[in-house]
């Protein structure tokens, strides 16, 4: 974070602007909207600023900048056409520990101006830290188009009702849920349609019946996807933004966790093959306890909760204890990681089916049907199999799969650090040995398409490939794509 985002209350505070031209006028316009007491140090003013001075909206000092001008002001803006003067203002302000901005000179600023979306009292600031002002402006334009003009009215009405809601609903959780419901319901729709009187009546009615409608605690089982925060579903984002507490595992990326509601409690309940482990029974008991406390719990799991995620076991526990629950599916690693590696799971020339299996089973689980897994013309995806890669390769070859079958190990799938190492079934153990976890094993002729279809990260530039040729793919030329 290059700059700390902060909103300053300038109402009635003295602010010094050095300069009397168009650049100074633009900054002064913003300062006046914020209620600042604007003082202008300049020998001459342009027509716009002269009019403001005549109306006593700004205090014109009618002289060149002097060091004494900065002593009694809250912050300083240097907006003259004289660069040497602007930098002198900067150094004097710095020596007095006063916030200072030299317009269009990032190296001489202790604060900068963001692009602003103004729906007063709602304000949204967008900044590129001065690196790409045009990008910040484009982002502001997109946000302007997304946010309704009625947003300010909604905030003003809500502000008038805050005390009433606080008096009726005693806990922070109750109040937060109440407002979330209003901002996503009929109240918001009425304000959007400029029916503010009806909106306030709706608010009053909702508040009157809010205590009776409180449903207490619940658990939402949310699939976080394979890692890339952009692959989290909209429903999943809504759930983690409304959660009181989030129980997450080791496969949930930092990018996903950064989207969790800031005030929500976060509890790690993960499992790692070579390290920290939270017993599943403890996680189940924790979900039940938190829900019974009336909290909105999100059980956030990497990938999809019902694909080797023990989601079914967790829901059985909740059902047994009569805890309300819901499920938000996620993109499983076999789908996400292979797509980012340029490996299609099915392809009518090479694979008519895809099989997902886990390399980490219960001790009393039935024997694996290796004969079925060793079939050709299918794609085999193995979760949590890196530690058993040698055994997997041996058994598949024993049951008829060719040692020349293309194979890949995808680690850190869909994340910037994603690596895809390709080879054959014969050297699968070698590929897996150096792959960081989490890693996914993919076996099948479709792996041969990786070289042509890789598009993401380093693999998109042709790196991390074990040199192999695959006869089955010989018909695909550099400019040709299979159907």
From Swiss-Prot:
Pathway: Cofactor biosynthesis; adenosylcobalamin biosynthesis; precorrin-2 from uroporphyrinogen III: step 1/1; Cofactor biosynthesis; adenosylcobalamin biosynthesis; sirohydrochlorin from precorrin-2: step 1/1; Porphyrin-containing compound metabolism; siroheme biosynthesis; precorrin-2 from uroporphyrinogen III: step 1/1; Porphyrin-containing compound metabolism; siroheme biosynthesis; siroheme from sirohydrochlorin: step 1/1. The lineage of its organism: Bacteria, Pseudomonadati, Pseudomonadota, Betaproteobacteria, Neisseriales. Residues 1-203 are annotated as: Precorrin-2 dehydrogenase /sirohydrochlorin ferrochelatase. InterPro entries: 4pyrrol_Mease, 4pyrrol_Methylase_sf, 4pyrrole_Mease_sub1, 4pyrrole_Mease_sub2, CobA/CysG_C, NAD(P)-bd_dom_sf, Siro_Cobalamin_biosynth, Sirohaem_synt_dimer_dom_sf. PANTHER family: SIROHEME SYNTHASE, SIROHEME SYNTHASE-RELATED. This is Siroheme synthase. The active site is at 249 (proton acceptor), 271 (proton donor). One of its GO terms (biological process) is methylation. The modification Phosphoserine is found at residue 128. S-adenosyl-L-methionine binds at residues 226, 302-304, 307, 332-333, 384, 413. In the N-terminal section; belongs to the precorrin-2 dehydrogenase / sirohydrochlorin ferrochelatase family. Gene3D superfamilies: Cobalt-precorrin-4 Transmethylase, Domain 1, Methyltransferase, Cobalt-precorrin-4 Transmethylase, Domain 2, NAD(P)-binding Rossmann-like Domain, Sirohaem synthase, dimerisation domain, Siroheme synthase, domain 2. Keywords: Cobalamin biosynthesis, Lyase, Methyltransferase, Multifunctional enzyme, NAD, Oxidoreductase, Phosphoprotein, Porphyrin biosynthesis, S-adenosyl-L-methionine, Transferase. NAD(+) binds at residues 22-23, 43-44. Its EC number is 2.1.1.107, 1.3.1.76, 4.99.1.4. The keyword Cell membrane does not apply. The keyword Iron does not apply. Residues 217-483 are annotated as: Uroporphyrinogen-III C-methyltransferase. It catalyses: uroporphyrinogen III + 2 S-adenosyl-L-methionine = precorrin-2 + 2 S-adenosyl-L-homocysteine + H(+); precorrin-2 + NAD(+) = sirohydrochlorin + NADH + 2 H(+); siroheme + 2 H(+) = sirohydrochlorin + Fe(2+). GO terms for molecular function: NAD binding; precorrin-2 dehydrogenase activity; sirohydrochlorin ferrochelatase activity; uroporphyrin-III C-methyltransferase activity. Pfam families: CysG_dimeriser (PF10414), NAD_binding_7 (PF13241), Sirohm_synth_M (PF14824), TP_methylase (PF00590). Then it catalyzes the NAD-dependent ring dehydrogenation of precorrin-2 to yield sirohydrochlorin. Finally, it catalyzes the ferrochelation of sirohydrochlorin to yield siroheme.
